[in-house]
């Protein structure tokens, strides 16, 4: 599993060294947007927390232009497309309700501090996240991906809705300003299903075996639901690097 702050190059980038602390040219062109790949699963509570912290960090740094790319990671790649009863999943994943309750209690407490309401008791099914990831990928064409991701997390973890159900997904898409008919037509097809599985495989090949994971400028990665201050520090490092190497969008 990736370390908390992994400052290695996970993409094939040159081995040029960078000297920090030098003079900055204030007349330099406006920096390109910093590319951030958000590797996540929509059924992962830690991803909900991590994404919330990332977006909160970015909101307080309007000086830092970024381009978000939402990359799927399948924690349950063998999950039936129709999902499974929550009780069966908890037994298979945690070995019983008691262990799950302890874990969920800890996550719920952390969520409260972030303004995230986890209501695990409302969940009746554990869905496959493939179609939800497909919908996010589709929504990115219309600039709605970040909004949709947060809406999907809230629907699943707060409202207990089945985000593997097509009617639920269409309703959530519509609530984010997307056309319900177009969303339904897309989900009814097989479009991007192979792409979701390919992106999941790519993440594993990069050495990512846990989420959330934020890959910044193809050179650095930060794993886990880190505090905003930790995220911000790495973003600043990557932004300085980008000025020297021309790494960006």
Enumerate the predicted regions with their spans.
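Structural alpha/beta surface segment adjacent to cysteine/selenocysteine redox centers
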Residues: 51-159, 245-249
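C-terminal cap of thioredoxin/glutaredoxin-like
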Residues: 18-20, 25-32, 38-39, 43, ...
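Intrinsically disordered, low-complexity repeat segments enriched in small/polar residues
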Residues: 11-13, 21
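Extreme N-terminal basic, low-complexity initiation segments
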Residues: 1-11
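Generic alpha-helix initiation/capping and coil-helix boundary signal
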Residues: 4-5, 104, 132, 166, ...
């Amino acid at each position: 599993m990736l370390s908390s702050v992994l400052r290695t190059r996970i993409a094939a980038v040159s081995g040029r060294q960078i000297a920090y602390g030098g003079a900055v040219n204030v007349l330099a062109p406006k920096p390109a947007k910093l590319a951030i790949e958000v590797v996540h699963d929509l059924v992962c509570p830690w991803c909900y927390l991590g994404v919330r912290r990332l977006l909160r960090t970015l909101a307080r740094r309007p000086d830092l232009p970024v381009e978000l790319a939402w990359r799927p990671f399948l924690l349950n790649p063998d999950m039936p497309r129709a999902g499974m009863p929550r009780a069966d999943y908890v037994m298979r994943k945690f070995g019983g309700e008691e262990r799950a309750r302890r874990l969920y209690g800890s996550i719920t407490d952390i969520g409260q501090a972030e303004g995230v309401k986890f209501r695990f008791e409302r969940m009746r099914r554990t869905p496959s996240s493939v179609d939800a990831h497909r919908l996010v990928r589709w929504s990115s064409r219309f600039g709605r991906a970040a909004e949709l991701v947060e809406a999907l997390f809230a629907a699943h973890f707060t409202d207990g809705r089945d985000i593997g159900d097509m009617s639920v997904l269409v309703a959530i898409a519509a609530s984010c300003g997307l056309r319900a008919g177009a969303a339904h037509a897309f989900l009814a097809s097989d479009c991007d299903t192979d792409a979701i599985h390919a992106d999941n495989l790519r993440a594993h090949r990069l050495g990512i075996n846990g989420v959330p994971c934020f890959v910044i400028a193809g050179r650095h990665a930060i794993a886990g639901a880190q505090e905003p201050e930790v995220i911000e520090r790495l973003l600043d490092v990557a932004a300085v690097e980008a000025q020297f190497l021309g790494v960006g969008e």
